[in-house]
Each structure stands twice: as structure tokens, then as C-alpha cells.
Amino acid sequence: MTLLKRYHIYGERSSGTNFLDHSIKDNFDAINVFADDVKDVDDIIERCRKYGHKHWFGDDLDLSDTDDILFLCIVRDPIDWLRSIYRTPRNLYEPMVESQERFLFGKYASTAVFYDEKVSFKLGGYEYCNNIFEVRHIKLEWICEKLPKLVKNYMLIRYEDLKNDFQGTMKKIKDMGLIKKNDISEDIVKMKKWMKRDDLDDPIATFDFAQKDPKVKLQPTYYRPNYKPFNFSIEDYPKEFLHYEKVLGYLR
């Protein structure tokens, strides 16, 4: 087995990419090839063109000469993911969350993180699809089918497994060749304590609180949560986009 000291992560927003990256940094002597030791803007642009951003990736990448890199992909239960995205719509156009119906079945549009002529619109953060199910389906297809054929070292992780079997997941990453530190953290509570992505332990970040305090009833943005209730189940999921949810074990 070849020992690896470099890695890259792919996954949608609110799928656990930060949690996974933080866990790797705590437990392995490895460098994130996209995010670590960035020199300047030109360096970021070149890395984006070569490897892709963790959230924006696809066929436009140049993944040649990457045999010394472990590519980790993380996915999350579709309903939990939709609820989290609806709650905190990072980099989505604000009209998308005017209502649950608009969010689920209206046109999907993602705002750009940056733009440069050397990088395609898609890799810079621009995304346009018929709906949010379609964009997830396209990304899952690339993660599950295309990426494994492009790189030597590939691993797919479910957010639920990272959360519920942290030790087991870290061991699987070690078995892929990433060089571990002396001890792997056993305290999952400590590992998740810093991550307030869903604000589940914050009493003011709840729908009930929003009803009590009209000052926080604002249109949700990147920084402001959406307090509207979200009622949607896998039974309502469009059938044409269920294939990869079944492959990933999310159809019960």
C-alpha cells in the first residue's frame, strides 16, 4: 500500500465537507491540496482549475498526475440535506427560498464564489439546473461513477457513517493509505462541538424563537437562517432522481 500525504474532498454544501476536513486534520499528517498553504489568488485559481472546489467539480477538471492524492467524497441523506440547505441557503439566489415549493421545484441557481477566465463558470460556483434534485443527481453521478475512473485513490463516505461510526470511518481512511497521527480522536462530541452548521444546540436558532421575536423574521441569506418549517419526505422525491439515493442506501 502506498502511503499518502495529500487529499482532496468533494461534496455538496451542508453534506459534512468541513466536518470531514476538520477530522482529517486532527487525525492525519496530510495536506488538503486545494485549501492548505495557498500563496495568492493565482494559486487558488490554478488549484480550482486542476482539482476543483470542494463544492463545485465535474468534467472540466484536470485530474492527471494525481496518483499521490486521496480523493474523498462525502454524501448526506437527501432529506436531511435538503432541510439543511433550505435552513441555511449558502450561495443560492435568495428567491429560491421564498417558499418550500419554489425551493424544491423551481429553477436552481447558485451564485459565484469567484470568477476568472481560466476557470469555467461551473467551477467558479455558477450552477443552473431545472431544480435542486437535478443538481444533486448530476453531482452524485460524477461522484459515484465518473470520478472513480479518473483517479487512483478514491473513497466515498456517508455523512451518517462519519457521525455515527467515527472510529470506523477514520480507520477506513487510514486503510486507504493516508498517514495518521499517533492517536485517532475517540471523542465524537468533541469533534462535532465546533460545527454549528445546523444550529441544533442553539436555542435562538429555532422556528419557535422566530415566532416569538419578529426582529429575526428576515429573508434568509448566507448569514441568516430560514425559520420556515420544512415538510418533505423521501416518498415525495421525484422518481427520476432516485437512482443514486438507492445506490447510496438512502431508500428505506
Give the ranges of each region predicted by the language model.
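PAPS-dependent sulfotransferase catalytic domain
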Residues: 1-107, 111, 128-155, 250
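PAPS-dependent sulfotransferases, especially Golgi type II membrane carbohydrate sulfotransferases
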Residues: 1-6, 147-148, 176-252
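Generic structural marker for isolated residues within well-ordered, non-membrane alpha-helices
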Residues: 21, 170, 241
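Residue-level detector of secondary-structure transition/capping positions
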Residues: 28, 89-90, 170, 174-177
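Short, solvent-exposed coil/turn linker segments
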Residues: 62, 99, 158-161, 172, ...
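Surface-exposed, flexible loop/turn segments at secondary-structure boundaries
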Residues: 79-80, 162, 196, 200
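A short, charged helix-loop
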Residues: 106-124
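Phosphate-binding beta-loop-alpha motif at adenosine-nucleotide cofactor sites
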Residues: 150-176
